[in-house]
A protein has these predicted regions:
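A short, Lys/Arg-rich alpha-helix, primarily the initiator
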Residues: 1-11
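Short alpha-helical DNA-recognition segment
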Residues: 14-31
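Hydrophobic micro-packing sites on short alpha-helices
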Residues: 45-49, 59-60
Length: 67
């Protein structure tokens, strides 16, 4: 699943470490999410969207939608 996590995080001036702490995950998890190596659980996706005050669809792009 593609995402705009890195773009949104950087636009808000937040480090990977700060985001990881807020989400209660490791910095490595944030990096893996940003690089598309890891798809978040639905709970983590909601936490990310809530943290940035955006919809899940603004962060995560379902590849099936692009077809």
């Amino acid at each position: 699943m593609k995402n705009r996590l890195e773009e949104i995080r950087k636009a808000k001036g937040i480090t990977q470490e700060e985001l990881a702490n807020a989400l209660e995950v490791s910095r490595q998890t944030v990096g893996s999410l940003e690089n598309g190596r890891y798809n978040p659980s639905i709970i983590l996706a909601f936490k990310i969207a809530r943290f940035f005050e955006v919809s899940i669809e603004e962060v995560f792009i379902c590849e099936e939608d692009e077809k």
